[in-house]
Amino acid sequence: MKLHQGLVCLSVLILLPTCILGDRKFEVYWNIPTFMCPDQNKTIMDLNKKHGVIQNTEDLFRGDKISLLYHPGAFPAITRNKTTNTLIYENGGVPQAGNLSLHLKLLEKDINEQITDKNFSGLAVIDFELWRPIFRQNGGSLSDYQNLSLKLEKDLHPEFNEDQLRKEAERRIEKFGRSFIKQTLIKAKKLRPKAQWGYYAFPYCFNGRRRYVDTCIPSAKIDNDRILYMFENSDVIYPAVYLQTDLAQKNQTGLVKGRVDEAVRMAKMVKKPAKPPVLVYHRYVFTDTLEYISKENTTAVFKAMKDNGADGVIIWGSSFDLNSKEKCAKFLDYLREVLWPVIDEVKRS
């Protein structure tokens, strides 16, 4: 596996790199539901192979090369009833009130159903975005997790003042959150030991705007140091870089640099001889408009990933992008005019 210091990577189990001196190899993985495009999908599979893109056999969305699991098991969660606008607490709502044994039991069921091959050796990505294992990161749209955590402590300790309540809420959500995060990886690796497990989007960086463009905000680095246990139990680190139209190109590449730098930093901190490689999730459209990202911008973004130490990119797409014949035809044109030429250029560089 890559040590992030100007190395060349030879494939182990086809997927993951091991290193010798020289230029680094940059892998490209396909996580787009192009099986929804029956008129184009054979052409896409054939040309992906020609351009060195790693894709599941038969264009399956979950297959032999990569499987993305959305909220597997029974992570504690707070959802909202859309009709009554009332909160629903699933498995306790927050980790300190959750049943870890129940979660692990249902996790095993989900993994057995979604990754049926016990010898699966591809990328296994856990997409977990319900809450964060750091208390202060559960603000804004995630503030229900802070509020419930504080309420639980107030019920347990009515004599506590506000500062004491907050400190105890922080301590407990992070303690039990760590158990859910870590034990999920341990269980997953026991069930599919050859798979390359990791959590989608971590480490968070919160960069791209104002003063912190090409580096994480300072508190994010402190927080990531505190969740080193996640990366020490991961086989791969999967940060995410999605773009919006209001970011200038220099800020787009800065966004990439900051997030890749942080992922590489965490990989280097892992106390193992073989450091986890960094594979960056990227969407080929702007998330605010769903317009295709230009060839110029895509080239700059992919080169920024490679230049800053990423081992590869996972190109992700939504079913919404490909839910009509017109969209499928347009996407094939985009592949021919933009993505495949960019992939060739970045692999050569």
UniProtKB/Swiss-Prot annotation:
It catalyses: Random hydrolysis of (1->4)-linkages between N-acetyl-beta-D-glucosamine and D-glucuronate residues in hyaluronate. Its main location: secreted. InterPro entries: Aldolase_TIM, Glycoside_hydrolase_SF, Hyaluronidase, Venom_Hyaluronidase. Expressed in salivary glands. The keyword Transmembrane does not apply. SUPFAM superfamilies: (Trans)glycosidases (SSF51445). Disulfide bonds join C37-C328, C205-C216. Glycans are attached at N41, N81, N99, N119, N147, N251, N297. Hydrolyzes high molecular weight hyaluronic acid to produce small oligosaccharides. This is Hyaluronidase Tab y 2.0101. It comes from Tabanus yao (Horsefly).
